[in-house]
A protein has these predicted regions:
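Nucleic-acid substrate recognition interfaces
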Residues: 1-239
């Protein structure tokens, strides 16, 4: 049976790729926020509860035709929506490639899907907490790199990264030959960058058993072991 495992690495400001990584996280935030802005305006337009604005269409003349088609289409995550976000990324000349742009949009899709699920639960009175539509990212946004953009050359040298990175993030020798599926970089609560390497590992599936042993650390005895089946308990004295 294969299971997913995660290894974490901290990225220091002195790292040779820190500036590049920071740029990627900022670009990811801008792409996420731009895509989310469009979705929020569409949501406000359909809800008739908020003021909405389509003035942003005029800011991108080359995308105007696509925008208007998308508004008429009135579907959140259509093929046309993905195309608009990819064209926006190219227009802004971001360093993030289109595969990563798609990952960012997919993450936004998950956020909106969660909102609709919670809204349905609230309407069915199975959820009573306040819910909000997905908000904008403030400073950075997670960037996920799948195995298609992971540099095999760097991985052999003991680094996880893309071809555009000067060096990549140093990993331990035991991680070189892992079945690496992707890695992602984000900023944590302390505003520090963290890299997570996600890999798959084959593990032996253990058969479930009804037999249980319980260990109790005692005062007079060092410990006592009791069983839930026909076996005499064990008591070990400390002296």
């Amino acid at each position: 049976m294969k299971v997913k495992r995660i290894v974490k690495f901290n990225i220091k400001k002195s790292h040779i790729d820190y500036k590049y990584i920071k740029t990627q996280l900022i670009e990811s935030k801008e792409i996420y926020n731009f895509a989310n802005y469009i979705l929020r305006q569409l949501y406000f337009k359909n809800s008739n509860k908020h003021k909405y604005s389509l003035n942003f269409i005029e800011e991108y003349p080359t995308l105007k035709e696509l925008f208007l088609k998308y508004i008429d289409e009135n579907k959140q995550f259509s093929t046309l929506f993905y195309k608009i976000i990819c064209e926006f990324s190219k227009l802004r000349q971001y360093s993030i490639n289109l595969k990563i742009v798609q990952n960012i949009v997919n993450k936004l899709k998950n956020d909106w899907t969660s909102y609709w699920k919670l809204l349905k639960m609230k309407m069915n009175k199975t959820y009573d907490k306040k819910i909000n539509i997905p908000r904008y990212k403030k400073k950075y946004n997670l960037v996920e790199y799948n195995n298609q953009v992971i540099s095999k050359k760097k991985l052999k040298l003991g680094y996880i990264g893309t071809d555009k990175m000067k060096q990549g993030i140093k990993i331990a020798n035991r991680h070189k030959n892992l079945d690496c599926k992707c890695f992602r970089i984000y900023n944590n609560k302390n505003d520090k960058f963290v890299c997570e390497l996600i890999y798959e590992k084959e593990v032996i599936e253990v058969e479930k058993t009804d037999r249980v042993a319980s260990i109790d650390i005692g005062l007079e005895n060092l410990f006592t072991i009791a069983f839930n089946y026909n076996k005499k308990g064990i008591s070990i004295k400390g002296s």
